[in-house]
Swiss-Prot record:
Designated gene of the protein: timm10-a
Membrane-protein topology: Peripheral membrane protein
GO molecular-function term, one example from the UniProt record: metal ion binding
Protein name: Mitochondrial import inner membrane translocase subunit Tim10-A
Disulphide bridges, residue numbers: 32-57, 36-53
Binding partners and assembly: Heterohexamer; composed of 3 copies of TIMM9 and 3 copies of TIMM10/TIM10A, named soluble 70 kDa complex. The complex forms a 6-bladed alpha-propeller structure and associates with the TIMM22 component of the TIM22 complex. Interacts with multi-pass transmembrane proteins in transit.
Length: 93
């Protein structure tokens, strides 16, 4: 692959990854806020219960996100190995 095209592709993938991370952060923030903070609140500060709820919600969300990332990486590596084996099988015939 042309080095310039490879750099462009890497830059595009980085922008896409950053957008995905931002969207994931927005989803997490919205979901945890909806779950833990009542729609009509009277105080500007979070209550202890709301704070604990948000902490747990974010912790769970990040844990699941990490687990999914590891699993997707594992599956991606398996796919790469399978593709290499298939290419070796095609080139050896």
């Amino acid at each position: 692959m042309d080095p310039v095209k490879a750099q462009q592709l890497a830059a595009e993938l980085e922008v896409e990854m950053m957008a995905d991370m931002y969207n994931s952060l927005l989803r997490m923030t919205g979901a945890c806020h909806k779950k833990c903070v009542p729609p009509h609140y009277k105080e500007a500060e979070l209550s202890k219960g709301e704070s604990v709820c948000l902490d747990r919600c974010v912790s769970k969300y990040l844990d699941i996100h990490e687990r999914m990332g590891k699993k997707l990486t594992e599956l991606s590596l398996q796919d790469e190995e399978l593709m290499k084996k298939m290419q070796q099988g095609v080139t050896s015939t």
